[in-house]
Amino acid sequence: LGTEFNKKDGLATDPIQSATISGIYNHAKIDVWDNPVKVNVITDGVWGVREKIIATPGAFTSVDNEKANAKKQFSCIVLPQELNKAYFVVTLQTTTGKKYEWSPTENITIESGKKYTLNLSMGDNKLVLSKEGITANAWTDVAGGPRETD
C-alpha cells in the first residue's frame, strides 16, 4: 500500500475490502487424457463471455511507522489465456468504498503450469504496477496435507 495509507504510527488494519479481476474467460474444454493435459479456453458462443472474478483475500502485513508500506495479498486461479489489455482490469475496493483500478498497457499471456504474481502499489488515488512488475514461476510439488498458497 502506497503513501496515501501511511500514518504516523503505521497502518495496523487492512483498508482493502475486495479485489476483483475483470475481462477474463472463465470456461474451458479440458482434455485430461492428453499428456500434458490440454486446456482450450472457450472464447465464443454462450460460454465465451469475458467475466469478473472475486479474488480470495490473503495475508495482510501491517507496519508500525509512516515510512514503511503495508502489504496485502489476494489470490485467484485464471485459466491459461491471453489477457487483452482492452478488457483486463484489476479493481481494489477499500473499506470506505473507494475504488482503485489498474489495466495493463500490453496484453498479458498466462501460461499453463506457472504461478503469476502481479505486484501493484495502491495510493495517491491510483493503482500502478510496482517496480517488481509481473513475475511468473513454475508451480512446485509439495507433500500432501494442509497448505496455504500465495
Regions found by a protein language model. Name each.
Residues 99, 105-150:
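Extracellular beta-sheet/turn segments enriched in Thr/Pro/Gly and aliphatic residues
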